[in-house]
């Protein structure tokens, strides 16, 4: 895994190219990423960098976490995230340092992970895009039913994984191979082409794309 940044989804807007084309973009604030710990093979069994983002009141921080952050000399954040990196990259970082938008560049392909917007309990039409039944012509009280969910006495059960009604959204999702359309280094903003998971103000994780095409 590559080194990335933790950010906050600000919202969506659009920008224009020199040719006048409109590009929908999502604004992601990625400032104030602070390194809290460097993990190594010798001490932890693997190599990674631990990062915190945002701020949190001291009264909301547990004593073990407060001691952990004090050792690195950083302020408590809302999120703590680890990025698996190689030993060479870990040697360039140190606890207490900051990460900024210069990790990325315009045109780079990235993956963005976030928690999708919760929709509550949903039917199969909204949740799985099932077709609805006929409105008339002999159909009564079966307009939005999912249909058959299995056989009869044999096997006598509904197979696991059957697409049915249930809770929709509020799940961790990753959108891959998005493109960085613009970077505002002064305000520490990434403008990502297209939509990303989550609601406004939601926390997201931005990393270089793992399936980027050369």
Curated annotation (Swiss-Prot):
**A GO BP term, please?**
translation
Q: Name one GO molecular function term.
A: structural constituent of ribosome
| Modified-residue entries (N5-methylglutamine), positions | 153
- How does it get modified post-translation? Methylated by PrmB.
Q: Which domain of life is it from?
A: Bacteria
- GO cellular component terms, semicolon-separated: cytosolic large ribosomal subunit
Query: Which Gene3D superfamilies has this protein been placed in?
Result: 3.30.160.810, Translation factors
> Which keywords does this chain's UniProt record carry?
Methylation, Ribonucleoprotein, Ribosomal protein, RNA-binding, rRNA-binding
Sorted alphabetically, which InterPro entries does this protein's record hold?
Ribosomal_uL3 (IPR000597), Ribosomal_uL3_bac/org-type (IPR019927), Ribosomal_uL3_CS (IPR019926), Transl_B-barrel_sf (IPR009000)
Spans annotated as Disordered = 133-153
Q: Give the family from UniProt.
A: Belongs to the universal ribosomal protein uL3 family.
Q: Which PANTHER family match?
A: 50S RIBOSOMAL PROTEIN L3, LARGE RIBOSOMAL SUBUNIT PROTEIN UL3C
Q: How does it assemble?
A: Part of the 50S ribosomal subunit. Forms a cluster with proteins L14 and L19.
* Role this protein plays: One of the primary rRNA binding proteins, it binds directly near the 3'-end of the 23S rRNA, where it nucleates assembly of the 50S subunit.
Under NCBIfam families, the record lists: L3_bact
Q: What is this protein called?
A: Large ribosomal subunit protein uL3
Q: Which organism is it from?
A: Cupriavidus metallidurans (strain ATCC 43123 / DSM 2839 / NBRC 102507 / CH34)
């Amino acid at each position: 895994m590559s080194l990335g940044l933790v950010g906050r989804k600000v919202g969506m807007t659009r920008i224009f190219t020199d040719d006048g084309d409109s590009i929908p973009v999502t604004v992601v604030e990625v400032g104030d990423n602070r390194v809290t710990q460097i993990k190594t093979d010798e001490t932890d069994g693997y190599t990674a960098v631990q990062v915190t983002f945002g701020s949190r009141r001291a009264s909301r921080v547990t004593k073990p976490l407060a001691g952990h952050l004090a050792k690195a000399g950083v302020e408590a954040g809302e999120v703590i995230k680890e990025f698996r990196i190689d030993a060479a990259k870990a040697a360039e970082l140190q606890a207490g340092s900051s990460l900024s938008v210069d990790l990325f560049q315009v045109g780079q392909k990235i993956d963005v992970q976030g928690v999708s917007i919760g929709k509550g309990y949903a039917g199969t039409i909204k949740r799985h895009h099932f077709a609805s039944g006929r409105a008339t012509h002999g159909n009564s009280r079966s307009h939005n039913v999912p249909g058959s969910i299995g056989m009869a006495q044999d096997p006598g059960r509904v197979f696991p994984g059957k697409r049915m009604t249930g809770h929709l959204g509020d799940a961790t999702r990753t959108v891959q191979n998005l493109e960085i359309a613009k970077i505002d280094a002064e305000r520490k903003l990434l403008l990502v082409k297209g939509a990303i998971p989550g609601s406004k103000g939601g926390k997201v994780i931005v990393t270089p794309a793992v399936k980027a095409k050369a």
